[in-house]
């Protein structure tokens, strides 16, 4: 039975994740490296545990979260699908059970908003964890004069948290934004599709998605 640590400590896996991040860096994208995928893995695991799923189901989501962006090593376009295929081969090499592989690659192949669908709880957890990782430290470009809208939005987020209510009915993405760096409407301009996807993912887990910015609930 494959464990998260087997994947996390795999030299091949780490090489491909780092290579994928370098590719995106060259294209001007925000950080998609080990910091991002580790955060997504942890959040996906925590979401399922909080919602009463088993430790094993949560660990499978953790693995999927760690591998979800690996396809960027091939190309940004269709990286969810190429990543699922790459993860399939890596997981087979690591001796993973076919059932676990099936769940993981389904989650990876359906996580990107252009072709996404929260088809199972693992995928839903990965989507929420991935789209919820908005933070200043993901911005590579430190020249404010050359920021694009994605840089501005991420750089403006001073604090972020993804939490599930005590009664397990709402998952809330709570952001503190510096409005001198980015207007709230700028956030909506690039994240509207993502927020719609988060709402669908939350529904898959019997949750309602909420977005709170600077103390005001907007969704």
State each model region's role.
Residues 21-30, 181:
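Short hinge/gating elements
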Residues 32, 75-78, 186, 190:
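Short alpha-helix boundary/capping segments
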Residues 21, 41-45, 88:
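Amphipathic, well-packed alpha-helical segments that form the structural scaffold of globular domains
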Residues 2, 28-51:
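N-terminal low-complexity, intrinsically disordered segments
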Residues 4-22:
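Short alpha-helical hairpin
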